Amino acid sequence: MKPRIFIAIQYLEIGGAERSLIGLLNALDYMRCQVDLFVYRHSGEFMSLIPKGVNLLPEVKKYTTLTRPIREIVREGYWDIAAGRIWAHLLNSCYQRRSKRKDSIAIFQYIASCTTPFLPSLEQLGEYDLAISFLIPHNIVRDKVKARQKWAWIHTDYSFIDVNTRVELPVWGAFDRIISISESVSKGFLSKFPSLENKLMLMENILSEQFVREQAEMPFDDTFLRAFEGRKGQTDQPVRLCTIGRFSYSKCY
């Protein structure tokens, strides 16, 4: 019988972690393992890139409320999740005032801690050999999934951001392995959680050459390129560049 692997992520919109997950899924041998992918909300440009060998689990409506507008989920009757998210923002505001740090991602852990208790269990899916929480926060895989081994991924260099270590430590500590994507990420993580060194394991992102070439050859909207037409030789016209990223030190913004 093939080993059963469960992988969880919020959505598959364009992002580094999401692209990394697609690379990992493409690298797995589906003749040797069964992979169930649980995407909380079936949205994002990378949904179409999920390999055919992956079993995409159906959406569970209540899990979609974690990232949708609060006003919208209140209209649908999810008062418990809405209240949890509002309470999480209040807790985070108090934490930021105490720590005097503006670049904090502590809010994500507060939201997870305040909403996960209201989410339905996923144990009806049976016991997995391995459950992977691919993106923070990791409470859902910790609390709602039954597995012999549980691994959590860390994609962010914690030396650039502020987190509430008191709140996060019990979550990270519950996992059998913590997978870091680089040496610098490992170093930053251990600067916050030195007691978890024995659980940390390095596994760099998997991105195949074929995937990069396929993405490079995809058609795109050339509106941006047309904006530069006629600029050759015009030294008085500045070059305009556009970059996209989360407004935080960890993304160099």
Question: What are these model-predicted stretches?
Answer:
Residues 8-9, 181, 203, 241-245:
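Short hydrophobic "strand-cap" motifs at the C-terminus of beta-strands
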Residues 10-14, 33-103:
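N-terminal strand-loop element at the rim of the active site
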Residues 91-96, 112, 132-138:
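Short His-centered aromatic/hydrophobic patch
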Residues 110-119, 155-174:
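Nucleotide-sugar donor phosphate/pyrophosphate-binding loop at the beta->alpha transition
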Residues 130-158:
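Active-site proximal beta-strand in glycosyltransferases
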Residues 151-155, 159, 173-191, 195-224:
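Donor nucleotide-sugar binding/catalytic pocket of nucleotide-sugar-dependent glycosyltransferases
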